[in-house]
């Protein structure tokens, strides 16, 4: 039954009831009446707006007026209904399109979140594995304190939270001197004779039967081999460091990867083979030097000698100590057995980052390259800078001592290689290369007969005449490492194209 307003006798849009008379009114009309009279219109009893009680009913559908009974009126009513339906349909389509876009955006966000979660899970797993590797060595990583008496050597107050230095004891100082005496005696016995087994250069050719691409090592998604070294006792064993943060030991004779060593958190820029033990060494911009066991494919020692990127690495002739350089301006001398940093030195007068470091074959002196184009020669015993070789322009990229003990080759970002006589402390030859030629690696063969350089391409020079005899352009990217096999029977090179190539003289 429909409610009827007692005032208008029509169906009210907003019905309410008066508790005074129990009659139903249209709220709009009864409020006006109360405002004028203040009483109920039926029994004239006092009544206020607050006393009115709303009645909740379904929205009333008013009957069509008599005019809707004609055909034109019906057609107009149908047209109005059609317009209303179309407008409602259009609104629904707009809402549907908006909902679809929101759903698509939400799905993309969900997919991205899943990818991030997967990546973080992988990183956490890798970090846990690295932590498990480090835990057994935790007691050896931080050196014990032994005060240093040298004013320019980083001591307890200058250790930069890397631990105090173990110090250079008399026994440690004596060991390199004894080794140098033996090596000098052996060099004198050999004299200037060239080994009979040494290969003579006949012309540039690749090792027979090998594809020009040779072996692709390291990750294809993060391409680039940044460091190369050959085992001195077995040059068939190749050591490489890559942009993928890994170190790989490769056997040339079996064409097999012997070990993949993972642990660095950044790219590997320097690698060194131990001549007599199954150990290899690697350095990285993550400010660590890692010592690896090849048979176990595991890290046995982490040396934290620097605060900045480690830029150079060289093993002492005794096989017991490592020399490292860093862009924190220090070079460090560390014990590989204990992981202790024995001493750290910086040239306070220059205050410049070091770019590379290399021991002299005798091990009593060594050289470092700097960002300001200087080559500095250091005395290991006194830990003092004994000579400087200026002349380059641009950061020093590589240095190499000849096995004869007299020659030093240096390269910089000036497209030149300079040869220095260590007896006279002067530059006696400059190999001027093509403009924009980059040199990333220098090395003499074991006899001191050949000099190889790698960079824009690979070039081989014969010493004394200092003329180019071979030129290889096989790498599709920059050559980052070059090395000689035993008696120069082959040449190995690595590059940013992640390939390892071998050539014969």
UniProtKB/Swiss-Prot annotation:
UniProt-listed Enzyme Commission number(s): 2.3.2.27
Reaction catalysis annotation: S-ubiquitinyl-[E2 ubiquitin-conjugating enzyme]-L-cysteine + [acceptor protein]-L-lysine = [E2 ubiquitin-conjugating enzyme]-L-cysteine + N(6)-ubiquitinyl-[acceptor protein]-L-lysine
InterPro entries from the UniProt entry: G-protein_beta_WD-40_rep (IPR020472), Pre-mRNA_splic_Prp19_cc (IPR013915), Prp19 (IPR038959), RING-Ubox_PRP19 (IPR055340), Ubox_domain (IPR003613), WD40/YVTN_repeat-like_dom_sf (IPR015943), WD40_repeat_CS (IPR019775), WD40_repeat_dom_sf (IPR036322)
The keyword DNA repair belongs to this UniProt entry's keyword annotation: yes
Keyword field: Cytoplasm, Cytoskeleton, DNA damage, DNA repair, Lipid droplet, mRNA processing, mRNA splicing, Nucleus, Repeat, Spliceosome, Transferase, Ubl conjugation pathway, WD repeat
GO biological process: DNA repair; mRNA splicing, via spliceosome; protein K63-linked ubiquitination
Top-level taxon: Eukaryota
Keyword Nucleotide-binding: no
Database matches in Gene3D superfamilies: YVTN repeat-like/Quinoprotein amine dehydrogenase, Zinc/RING finger domain, C3HC4 (zinc finger)
Catalytic EC class: transferase
GO cellular component, one term: Prp19 complex
Pathway(s) the chain acts in: Protein modification; protein ubiquitination
WD repeats (start-end): 220-260, 263-302, 305-346, 349-388, 391-430, 434-473, 474-505
GO molecular-function term, one example from the UniProt record: ubiquitin-protein transferase activity
Major location category of this protein: nucleus
Assembly: Homotetramer. Component of activated, catalytic and post-catalytic spliceosomes. Component of the NTC complex (or PRP19-associated complex) which is associated with the spliceosome. Interacts with KHDC4.
Similarity comment: Belongs to the WD repeat PRP19 family.
Role this protein plays: Ubiquitin-protein ligase which is mainly involved pre-mRNA splicing and DNA repair. Required for pre-mRNA splicing as component of the spliceosome. Core component of the PRP19C/Prp19 complex/NTC/Nineteen complex which is part of the spliceosome and participates in its assembly, its remodeling and is required for its activity.
Protein name: Pre-mRNA-processing factor 19
Organism: Gallus gallus
Gene: PRPF19
């Amino acid at each position: 039954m429909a409610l009827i307003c007692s005032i208008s006798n029509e169906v009210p849009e907003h019905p309410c009831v008066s508790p005074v008379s129990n009659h139903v009114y249209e709220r709009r009309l009864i409020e006006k009446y109360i405002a004028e009279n203040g009483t109920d219109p039926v029994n004239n009893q006092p009544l206020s707006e607050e006393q009115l009680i709303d009645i909740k009913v379904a929205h009333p559908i008013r009957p069509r007026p008599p005019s809707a009974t004609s055909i034109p009126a019906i057609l107009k009513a149908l047209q109005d209904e059609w317009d209303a339906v179309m407008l409602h349909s259009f609104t629904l389509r707009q809402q549907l399109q908006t909902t679809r876009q929101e759903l698509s955006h939400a799905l993309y966000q969900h997919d991205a979140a899943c990818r991030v979660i997967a990546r973080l899970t992988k990183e956490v797993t890798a970090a846990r594995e690295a932590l498990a590797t480090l835990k057994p060595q935790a007691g050896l990583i931080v050196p014990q304190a032994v005060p240093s008496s040298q004013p320019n050597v980083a001591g307890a107050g200058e250790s930069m939270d890397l631990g105090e230095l173990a110090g250079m004891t008399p026994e440690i100082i004596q060991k390199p001197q004894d080794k140098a005496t033996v090596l000098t005696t052996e060099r004198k016995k050999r004299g200037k004779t060239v080994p009979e087994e040494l290969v003579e250069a006949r012309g540039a050719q690749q090792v027979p039967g090998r594809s020009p691409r040779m072996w692709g090592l390291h990750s294809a998604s993060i391409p680039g081999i940044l460091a190369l070294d050959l085992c001195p006792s077995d040059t068939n064993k190749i050591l490489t460091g890559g942009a993928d943060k890994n170190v790989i030991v490769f056997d040339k004779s079996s064409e097999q990867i012997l070990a993949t060593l993972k642990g660095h958190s950044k790219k590997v820029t320097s690698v060194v083979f131990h001549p007599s033990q199954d150990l290899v060494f690697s350095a990285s911009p993550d400010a660590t030097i890692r010592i690896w066991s090849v048979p176990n494919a595991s890290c046995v020692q982490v040396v934290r000698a620097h605060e900045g990127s480690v830029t150079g690495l060289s093993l002492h002739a005794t096989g017991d100590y490592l020399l490292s350089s860093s862009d924190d301006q220090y070079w460090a001398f560390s014990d590989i057995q204990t992981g202790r940093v024995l001493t750290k030195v910086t040239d306070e007068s220059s205050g410049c980052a070091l770019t590379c470091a290399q021991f002299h074959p005798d091990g009593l002196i060594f050289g470092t390259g700097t960002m300001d184009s200087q080559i500095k020669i250091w005395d290991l015993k006194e830990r003092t800078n004994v000579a400087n070789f200026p002349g380059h322009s641009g950061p020093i990229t590589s240095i190499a001592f000849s096995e004869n003990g007299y020659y030093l080759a240096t390269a910089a970002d000036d497209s030149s290689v300079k040869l220095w006589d260590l007896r006279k402390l002067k530059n006696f030859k400059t190999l001027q290369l093509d403009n924009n030629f980059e040199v990333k690696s220098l090395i003499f063969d074991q006899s001191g007969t050949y000099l190889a350089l790698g960079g824009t391409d690979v070039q081989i020079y014969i010493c004394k005449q200092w003329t180019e005899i071979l030129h290889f352009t096989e790498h599709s990217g920059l050559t980052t490492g070059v090395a000689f096999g035993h008696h120069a029977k082959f040449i190995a090179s690595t590059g940013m194209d992640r390939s390892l190539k071998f050539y014969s003289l």
